Amino acid sequence: MASNNVAQFAAELKMPAGVLLEQLQAAGVQKASEDDALSETDKARLLDHLRKSHGATDGDKRKITLTRKHTSEIKQSDATGKARTIQVEVRKKRTFVKRDDVSEGAEQGQAQVAEADDDAELKRREEEARREADLLEKQAQELRERQERLEREEAERRAREEAAEAERRRAEEEAAAKRVAAEAAAAQQQAAAQQAAAAEQQEAASTQSAQDEARAAAERAAQREAAKKAEDAAREAADKARAEQEEISKRRAAAEAEARAIREMMNTPRKAVVKAVEPPKPVEPPKPAEAKGTLHKPAKPEGAQARPAVKKPAGAAAPATTAPAGAGDRNKKPGAGKGGWQDDASKRRGIKTRGDSSGGVDRGWRGGPKGRGRHQDSSTFQAPTEPIVREVHVPETVSVADLAHKMSVKASEVIKVMMKMGQMVTINQVLDQETAMIIVEELGHRAVAAKLDDPEALLVEGETGTDAEQLPRPPVVTVMGHVDHGKTSLLDHIRRAKVAAGEAGGITQHIGAYHVDTPRGVITFLDTPGHEAFTAMRARGAKATDIVVLVVAADDGVMPQTKEAIAHAKAGGVPIVVAINKIDKPDANLDRVKQELVAEGVVPEEYGGDSPFVPVSAKTGAGIDDLLENVLLQAEVLELKAPVEAPAKGIVIEAKLDKGKGPVATILVQAGTLNRGDIVLAGTAYGRVRAMLDENGKPTKEAGPSIPVEIQGLSEVPGAGEEVIVLPDERKAREIALFRQGKFRDVKLAKQQAAKLESMLEQMGEGEVQNLPLIIKADVQGSQEALVQSLLKLSTDEVRVQIVHSAVGGISENDVNLATASKAVIIGFNTRADAQARKLAESNGIDIRYYNIIYDAVDEVKAAMSGMLAPEKREVITGMVEVRQVFKVPKIGAVAGCMVTDGIVKRSSSVRVLRNNVVIFTGELESLKRFKDDVKEVKQGFECGMSVKNFNDIVEGDQFEVFEVTEVARTL
């Protein structure tokens, strides 16, 4: 815009109006205020004046210098950690020279030289700006480190001062904090002021020439030096404050120790003596180092300081200052030598105890010197005035006696505390860790959860030492999805086998592990159940997998177990490949499936996500090759590797008890190589691998990474999901397995003991709660776990499912005997009872039910629980009666002559008496007559005589509401 006055021209030049007025007056242009008009002639005069003042001549108008300035902002953290915005200004200057026709070549060379100089100057300034930014960042980093060091030292200082008095500590900390904050604030304000001054100088220097810029650079160097000096001063002030605080803390600790020693001396109780004596002379307060007494070793008096600390023999001679024994006997009262309480006390004091420095020398009436010294020595015991707080390490399980020993108290004290807490325990009772820690805190000590002397630490040490070469391994792919969406059929088409036909009801109830050789490589598949009862089994599958293939039916969409599978995959951080199955069906809708999956957070690649969507058909085989290609592509991106020449490690996929083979476990090798004959440890089970079969039932000698195998030879059935590891010898495996078994048993018993009182109160509050005891035997560990969880979910407030026992294997006589004792029903899931068990069950009337589909087992147990529910009682109004006349009959009472106005009246019905439509009595009919004859019922429109049991206050005009109570069966 055109600048018509001084203020507008100053704004255009980005300079103060006052400075512009001074320059105009120096140029001979008389302008008094900012609002005065400014002409082009005035501007030309000002320009000539400025050129002359800077050394330019009128004839030299061939060269024009342009200065350009660019300002940007960067984020930089200061010493306090806060982000601050720093403005960075880059200046560029270019000189243009007007060419002459005569010396055009020379002028061009000069212009190039000038441009080269300008470029060099620009590079130099950019380098200087970059160095300044680096220096600022380095200074900020040093300030942060210094602040962290100061905070760390401040925390240590506070920890050392915790024993000091609260008020003094708080006041001194506040004073120190204020002083340090004031110094730091002063240093920061000084640095900020210097930076602001530097910024103002840079702003003012923007309108000056290259000479002014050189001066500004020198000034910035001086400012940096000043900032550095300010930081050094702040650091010295902080160090000085810290030294002062440490000196104050030391003096305070010494003063407190001296005060504590004086308090202990003043609070020491005097011992009872027979003879009244003068009070002893005051003892000098001990030094702080001498104030540390224990329960067994009181602080020594002044006269005993010269005695050596080593123990003396029992028969050592008394010191030279001790009077003869006869002199002490002469001062005894008559009868004092006959076993009075004074002699008993002296004998007890003479017993040699651990920590006693007297060596067993009698310090009582016999051993003391005559007169004053004797009585002074007898009153030197100092009882501890402050409780001794011990740090008690509490293991997972501990007996009452061991816990008392750890706290140096009698077991009876612990039993008293337990009785106050409502628990009756014995000295050998095992307590769990939580209860034991509560008792320790109750007795005034500090409880710490102890680290176990765990032999499993050897496993961790062994793992750190393995340094085998990492080689590529096949991917482990878990097939997940809703029930009946075609997971097993899809895998069946890949394996070219009929697996789904072998599953009961066409649904998968086990985890199947298979490895498939494809033209593109080996893939290991885990087929998980889709039924809602197998949540834990699906979680184990997601834990052991590398890639999840999510099978969704094109005609069904996203279902509850589909959402659960997505949650398992996301929790494990596993990539998902979506297989949209059943695309051959006429009602398949791929777009709807994609939209539903996008709502669950699974976005297809064509929508910008990272999950491949592959339409497949397990029936026709369409899309199978694309699915395998996408799976192997994901595996290639993951770069899966595992050591091969190393001891094997893996996870238990499934476990069962075979009648002929014993415990059988299906494991997935995750690292190393498992060979036949290796010693394996899986949870609480261990043993040597006697036989190893692949998924087709064929024997194999070894299994590498990502290969599933079935092993035999374990000591018991391991839990599904347990980690499998190969150990060098059987002794170590047995030691760790037995340790785990004992730990599990102790923790279980301790928790049962802790829950006894709670369960007793619960049973008292529950009242009439029906229990359905069940014994569950299944073929594999996963099915047993799923069935137990599904049945426990059926429990309600009125009927509760009680799992008496659950295990893997066939139904034996022990199970029948347990069912007889607990009156339980035995459920066999894919198992059968042997001949002896069946015969025993028939003789004892035990119900054994067999199932092979989890739906049926859950439904029948639910029906049995419904039968145990108390029936619901409902009232049905059968008729209304109006009282027309009341008769008083001796020995009977009031008899109402009535008219049945609605419904029917039966002799066995109940009745409510209504007066003015308000219920005044509810009871039963005592008699129902018609013309002096007893009748069973009277219908509408007939008259009858009625009497109500225990109610004679019948008035004409009353109404009788006749009703019956019926019971209705309830369902869950």
Swiss-Prot record:
Q: Where is this region: G5?
A: 617-619
For bias type Basic and acidic residues, the affected ranges are 48-63, 121-181, 212-263
Single annotated GO MF: GTP binding
Renumbered residue ranges of the record's region G4 = 581-584
What InterPro entries does the annotation carry?
DNA-bd_dom_put_sf, EF-G-like_DII, IF2_assoc_dom_bac, IF2_II, IF2_N, P-loop_NTPase, Small_GTP-bd, T_Tr_GTP-bd_dom
Q: Listed GO cellular component terms? A: cytosol
**Looking at the record, which segments are called G1?**
481-488
Disordered as annotated region, ranges: 48-85, 99-385
Q: Record-annotated residues binding GTP?
A: 481-488, 527-531, 581-584
* Organism domain of life: Bacteria
Biased composition regions of type Pro residues, renumbered to the chain: 279-288
- Provide the protein's localization: Cytoplasm
Q: Does the keyword Transmembrane helix apply?
A: no
Which SUPFAM superfamilies would you find in this protein's record? Initiation factor IF2/eIF5b, domain 3, P-loop containing nucleoside triphosphate hydrolases, Putative DNA-binding domain, Translation proteins
Low complexity bias: start-end ranges: 105-114, 182-205, 313-328
**Leader peptide range in chain numbering:** none
Keywords of the record: Cytoplasm, GTP-binding, Initiation factor, Nucleotide-binding, Protein biosynthesis
Q: What family is it from? A: Belongs to the TRAFAC class translation factor GTPase superfamily. Classic translation factor GTPase family. IF-2 subfamily.
* Protein name, per record: Translation initiation factor IF-2
The organism of origin for this protein: Burkholderia lata (strain ATCC 17760 / DSM 23089 / LMG 22485 / NCIMB 9086 / R18194 / 383)
